[in-house]
Amino acid sequence: MGRTLESKQQIVGELKELLAESELALVLDYKGLSIKEMSDLRDRLRAGNAVCKVTKNTLMRRAIDGDSAWSNLDSLLTGTNAFVLIKGDVGAGVKAVQAFQKETKKSETKGGLFEGKLLSQDEIKAIADLPSKEQLMAQIAGAINAVATKVAVGINEVPSGLARALKQHAEGGDS
């Protein structure tokens, strides 16, 4: 028995809400994945503030219809698709998908969409290679701390050098 019109409209509404909250969408070919493996993927994504939805391409097409930010996703809507919708830390979500794919060797990323632009496989891998927000903040804090330390050492060195010169002069060595 197929879904009722109300059920389909509800799914399209949920997809529209998820898309409105998402920054990045990945389209995966999930053919061959077991229910256990899909549950594993969903658990991994949940930790990275992402969600994996399996829905008919026609329902996703209806959800993106008229939305210029997501309209380019239409070209990826063929075959059996799972949609990974990532909000927040996109790098963590992409890393979770890639780690899952590396372990299972069953699913394949067809492509993605970020800020209205279709992403190739290489661009998706580049996003995964980016450091997380926390790592960037730590690097910046380390750089700022290093500069402050160098300034403090430099300021401290001036009186120390002067004191050594005065001591040497007082001991009678004019070199």
From Swiss-Prot:
Highest taxon of source: Bacteria
Signal peptide: none
Keyword set, alphabetical order: Ribonucleoprotein, Ribosomal protein, RNA-binding, rRNA-binding
Coiled coil: none
A GO CC term assigned to this protein in UniProt: ribonucleoprotein complex
Pfam families documented for this protein: Ribosomal_L10
GO molecular function: large ribosomal subunit rRNA binding
Gene3D superfamilies hit by this protein: 3.30.70.1730, 6.10.250.290
Function: Forms part of the ribosomal stalk, playing a central role in the interaction of the ribosome with GTP-bound translation factors.
Cited PANTHER family: 39S RIBOSOMAL PROTEIN L10, MITOCHONDRIAL (PTHR11560)
Assembly and oligomerization: Part of the ribosomal stalk of the 50S ribosomal subunit. The N-terminus interacts with L11 and the large rRNA to form the base of the stalk. The C-terminus forms an elongated spine to which L12 dimers bind in a sequential fashion forming a multimeric L10(L12)X complex.
Name by which UniProt lists this protein: Large ribosomal subunit protein uL10
Lineage: Bacteria, Bacillati, Cyanobacteriota, Cyanophyceae, Synechococcales
